[in-house]
Amino acid sequence: MRKRISAIIMTLFMVLVSCNSGGVAEDPKTVYLTSIANLGKGFLDVFVTFGDMVTGAFGIKADTKKSDIGKYFTDIESTMTSVKKKLQDEVAKNGNYPKVKTAVDEFVAILGKIEKGAKEASKGATGDVIIGNTVKNGDAVPGEATSVNSLVKGIKEIVGVVLKEGKADADATKDDSKKDIGKLFTATTDANRADNAAAQAAAASIGAVTGADILQAIVQSKENPVANSTDGIEKATDAAEIAVAPAKDNKKEIKDGAKKDAVIAAGIALRAMAKNGTFSIKNNEDAAVTTINSAAASAVNKILSTLIIAIRNTVDSGLKTINEALATVKQEDKSVEATNTAEATTSGQQAKN
């Protein structure tokens, strides 16, 4: 995409040079070519600006803080805001060609949804603790409902315009291996909390699915998830309800409705990102703490890296559409309003002289 836009800019530049080689005053055709070249350069600058956001997208680690995830979504929001403004400014400054303006307006609407979703999701990832925040010999703590809901709503908004791939019910590991994962969400005696085998089962579920699967499982979650105050994790039916499930004595199994790898991975990711969310591990199970914190980071990493790639692809596609519109613009396509404004400006300058 960047090469294609650069090629158009270079071609237009060469035409401009040939038009001005005689040193004559600018004619309408030259003004037109200049404005188109400026548009192309402006759109290339937008592409470069967006590319800056990709750096560090794959850097989520076990010691990454919840607030760092919130900042990541805030960065997506601010980048979309910047890209929207640059696109609109370039069209306004360089001719208001209706064909290009229509393509830009449609693209800006998509960017607006990404911006809105990122802003909402950023509200959910808060807290100056690491994303897994696993505790030994203590009860698991559910993700704050408001926090989880913001993450679900925001991610839904973004996924709705950037991602079609993924299976919300993706499932590859055996059911028997998943029966103990619910111990990560319990309140009970230490003997019944999760050990490293349970943590490894959770890691296996996360490893068995793609980032797109996890995102689609979040999309399929209910907004305003129900937290069952009696049966806790055993009444969870989707990823959001896994994330907010309260810890209850001896309630330690994820049931059939939610016992899918993609749903489990999404529930762990949401709980890991959300305010207050923790997992419960047996005392003296240091290996299990490392395992689940790393697994939670992996789930979050899959979500964010898949999102950024999907957003990048959407931006590439949008710029391609604008580029195609730019290539078809003719001198006479300039809007009447822009032409009149230019003529009025020229007349005013001549009057002053």
Swiss-Prot record:
A lipid is attached at C19 (N-palmitoyl cysteine). It holds the Pfam family Lipoprotein_2. It is found in: Cell outer membrane. SUPFAM superfamilies: Variable surface antigen VlsE. It is a lipid-anchor. PROSITE patterns: PROKAR_LIPOPROTEIN. The keyword Lipoprotein applies. Residues 332-353 are annotated as: Disordered. Disulfide bonds: none annotated. InterPro entries: Borrelia_lipo. Residues 337-353 have a biased composition (Polar residues). Keywords: Cell outer membrane, Lipoprotein, Membrane, Palmitate, Plasmid, Signal. Residues 1-18 form the signal peptide. A lipid is attached at C19 (S-diacylglycerol cysteine). One of its GO terms (cellular component) is cell outer membrane. Its main location: membrane. Genes for both Vlp and Vsp families are on (usually) unnamed linear plasmids in B.hermsii HS1. Belongs to the variable large protein (Vlp) family. Delta subfamily. The Vlp and Vsp proteins are antigenically distinct proteins, only one vlp or vsp gene is transcriptionally active at any one time. Switching between these genes is a mechanism of host immune response evasion. This is Variable large protein 17. It comes from Borrelia hermsii.
